[in-house]
Amino acid sequence: MADRRLQVFHTVARLLSFTKAAESLHMTQPAVTFQVRQLEEYFNTRLFDRTHNRISLTEAGQRVYGFSDRIFELYSEMENAVRDMTGEISGVLVMGASTTIAEYMLPALLGDFKKKYPDVNVHLRVSNSDGIVSMVENNDIDLGVVEAPVMNKNLVVEECRKDRLVAIVSPLHALAANRQVQVGELMSDAFIVREEGSGTREVIQDYLTELGMNVADLHVIMELGSPEAIKGAVEAGMGVSIVSEVTIHKELQLGTLVALELDPPIERLFSFVHQKQKFRQRAMDELLEFARTYCLSHQDDD
């Protein structure tokens, strides 16, 4: 409904990149460039300065960007007001989650949400915590759920639920009969960890720092990109690891892994992260409220 040229310009201005804007809008870069040039011709002035493979807004571009921000806020407010009158809750939302959350928490949440709001389609993108925060910053997703602290103060971060991490070993490991372990007792073991940028790895690093240690002090033999891969490696007797307790319910029941409580314990927060827009799609507000309620009702699942 809003002017397509203005939508494209606004995205380029926000990201300061034609390439990133094309990816965000699912357009080709030449198509994005064409739309911006059309708007520049309409105003008979340049909106961007292009130098050394970088772009910046001209004075006119800054003016247009400011007005376009207000226009899209009003458009969103109008859309929500009309949908409130008709009672319609529909649309497409893009949600992002770090690997652990996407695999073990969101399937049930999104399944229940879809039953309540069948006309809302939720697309899920999976990355590590750093990747999800970056997607929120670039407006590539409407709502993110992460397992590590968010440093960007311009984003809204809401606590969802606590998560506990435990050490896992194979049933044949020398410590398998124990109930509790200190991380120092695992220092000589082959260690399997998540990749850089993972929320799990960041939390473990912070934990070790508090104990006067570092990930580099561990005998790391492998970095893997998902809890499933780590569990498989530990089950095969390749080493030990530290993972979220929510990821190992099945393996504990089957007896293929043994969980050891850490002393002192490691706890972290699963958090929602989103932009500070004053006005959002009604469907986004409903998803956020549904997710808050879901988190409260599942606080004691572990």
Where on the chain are the PLM-derived regions?
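A late-sequence structural motif
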Residues: V258-D301
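Conserved amphipathic alpha-helical core elements
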Residues: L39-E40, F113
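Flexible hinge/capping segments at coil-to-helix
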Residues: V157-I192, E196, R282
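Secondary-structure junction motif
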Residues: F191-G212, Q281-R282, H298-Q299
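Central regulatory/effector-binding core of bacterial HTH transcription factors
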Residues: S90-K153
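Hydrophobic hinge/microswitch elements
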Residues: N128-V133, E137-I141, V146-E147, T209-L257
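A short LG(V/I)-centered, amphipathic sequence patch enriched
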Residues: E40-L57
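Short helix-boundary/capping micro-motifs
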Residues: H10-T28
